[in-house]
Regions:
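Conserved ABC transporter NBD signature motif
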Residues: 62-73, 77-78
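ABC ATPase "signature
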Residues: 217-218
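Catalytic Walker B motif of ABC-type/P-loop ATPase nucleotide-binding domains
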Residues: 158-162
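Conserved ABC ATPase "signature" region
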Residues: 83, 102, 106-129
Length: 272
């Protein structure tokens, strides 16, 4: 590991494409077994830093280590220590969920591929859908399967590049629960996102990347301290759309029974 004990450490990372500077002197450090959210709008450089840390792209300047290995001098060791999940689930839709996992385990030359597949299916609540073709899975199920596949071989570090892009609210919550479980099992997670609520829900630490630079880095509590105290006035709280959605759907949305136990909104006739 690095001297600081960090699972991921980057110092002075710079990257330009032609005359456009994408990353400008980026520093970051991620402790072992934590979730670190890199927050920023499209084009901020989030995917570029992930590519550099996962050895897919060389920086123009700076140094980085992942799981104790330098990404420039020991790229093979870095790749053995990580898993990368991109913005869209990289699963074979023709195969079943279990077949996808078994295939990945065999590609990684892991023993007991079938048992590992069954364990991961149970861990990510996919056992009932194990033999179904992935083409029939919902977006949330596909993403959970994708994350499960990334755990084969027990990599200590996982990069999740905008893992909930294109998912509906219920599917996003399913993925959030899976990500929280990863950290609970000791896996280090670097998560990129442009969703503020996602970073707030998941991250132990949050860094904001803007125009290629880290402009703030800290815990949620530390970031809140950057703002002046809010003036408190009594306002009757109205439920948000998210409150309504979660109250109606809850966990029942996973099996298609959403709303069976929820109160229905009154019709115009009932209102009269």
């Amino acid at each position: 590991m690095t001297q600081s004990g960090a699972a991921i450490a980057a110092r002075g990372i710079r990257k330009s494409f032609v005359e456009h500077t994408v990353l400008d002197d980026v520093d970051l450090e991620v402790d072992q077994g934590t979730i670190f959210a890199l927050l920023g709008p499209n084009g901020a450089g989030k995917t570029t830093i992930v590519k550099i840390l996962s050895t897919l792209l060389r920086p123009d300047a700076g140094t980085a280590t992942v799981a104790g290995f330098d990404v420039a001098t020991h790229p093979a060791d870095v790749r053995e220590s990580i898993s990368l999940t991109g913005q869209f689930a990289a699963v074979d839709e023709i195969l079943s969920g279990r077949e996808n996992l078994v295939l990945m385990a065999r590609l990684r030359r892991v023993k007991d591929a079938g048992q590992i597949a069954d364990d991961l299916l149970a861990r990510f609540q996919l056992t009932d859908a194990a033999t179904r073709r992935v083409a029939t899975y919902s977006g949330g199920m596909r993403r959970r399967l994708d994350i499960a596949m990334s755990l084969i071989g027990n990599p200590p570090v996982i990069f999740l590049d905008e893992p909930t892009t294109g998912l509906d609210p219920q599917a996003r919550i399913e993925v959030w629960n899976s990500v929280k479980e990863l950290a609970g099992q000791g896996t280090t997670v670097l998560l990129t996102t442009q969703y503020l609520d996602e970073a707030e829900q998941l991250a132990d630490r949050i860094a904001i990347l803007h125009e290629g630079r880290i402009i703030v880095n800290g815990t949620l509590a530390e970031l809140k301290q950057l703002l002046p105290p809010a003036k408190v006035e009594y306002v009757e709280k109205q439920p948000t759309l998210e409150d309504i959605f979660l109250a109606i759907v809850g966990t029942a949305g996973k099996d298609g029974n959403a709303g069976n136990e929820a109160a229905s909104a009154p019709t115009s006739k009932e209102q009269r």
